[in-house]
Regions:
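Short amphipathic alpha-helical segments with heptad-repeat character
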Residues: 44-47, 51-54, 58, 84, ...
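Intrinsically disordered regulatory regions flanking bHLH/HLH domains
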Residues: 30-51, 99-109, 113-130
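A structural signal for well-ordered alpha-helices, especially hydrophobic packing surfaces
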Residues: 54, 61-64, 68, 94, ...
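Intrinsically disordered, compositionally biased, charge-dense segments
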Residues: 1-40
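Helix-loop segments that flank and shape redox-cofactor active sites
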Residues: 42, 59-85, 147, 151-162
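Acidic/histidine-rich alpha-helical segments that form the ligand environment
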Residues: 49, 113-169
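Conserved alpha-helical segments that form or flank metal/cofactor-binding pockets of metalloenzymes
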Residues: 77-114
Length: 188
């Protein structure tokens, strides 16, 4: 049974100004169905796709970090440093996209379980061979680039130009990293 926490009435302190009420606006009430933009784009579905891409970025961060730790080969030092840059970049990418979602007054999942529920299918690393690990990560980076391209087009439809511009940048980052891995794999 729920017992309400006892409420203690505070008395105002003498000479201490009380904080202004209403300084921070309350979040807007959300309609039950997905919101529509002026161009009749489905903003709610767009945000779900953004959250799905955030989940993908978080998984890429984990994957690149674990490959960074487990990779062995004659080119270890270069690959190790590159993958450190990558997992740090994926964290920054996740954070940036999540902040765009919040700027549109939508919430992110509260834990890893919520992110996993939103996650699209991702290629998993199943071998400790360096070339195999990098090959899987390469495919996932290519997929990241394609997902960001699709989301860029959706962002245009709902007039989210900040996200549209960021998706174009993310496409470039994903394909550049994929190219660098492909060039590394050709020499192994």
């Amino acid at each position: 049974m729920y017992t309400q926490y006892p409420r203690i009435e505070a008395t105002p302190l003498q000479g201490v100004p009380s904080p202004q009420s209403g300084v921070v606006p309350e979040p807007q009430a959300k309609p039950k169905g997905p919101a529509k933009s002026k161009a009749n784009g489905d903003v709610g579905a767009f945000i779900q796709q953004c959250i799905s891409l955030c989940s993908y970025l978080k998984e890429l961060e984990t994957q690149s970090h674990l490959i960074h730790l487990n990779y062995e080969g004659s080119n270890f030092l270069g690959v190790h440093a590159f993958l450190k840059e990558q997992y740090e970049a994926h964290l920054e990418q996740f954070d940036t996209l999540a902040e765009f979602i919040r700027s549109m007054d939508y919430m992110m999942p509260m834990c890893g379980c919520g992110l996993k529920d939103a996650a699209p299918v991702m290629n998993a690393v199943t071998s400790y061979k360096g070339a195999d690990m990098l090959g899987v990560y390469y495919k996932n980076l290519e997929e990241l680039g394609m997902k960001a391209k699709k989301l860029e087009a959706l962002a245009e439809k709902v007039h989210a130009i900040d996200i549209q511009n960021y998706m174009a940048d993310l496409v470039g980052q994903a394909f550049k990293a994929a190219w660098m891995i492909k060039a590394t794999l050709r020499n192994s």
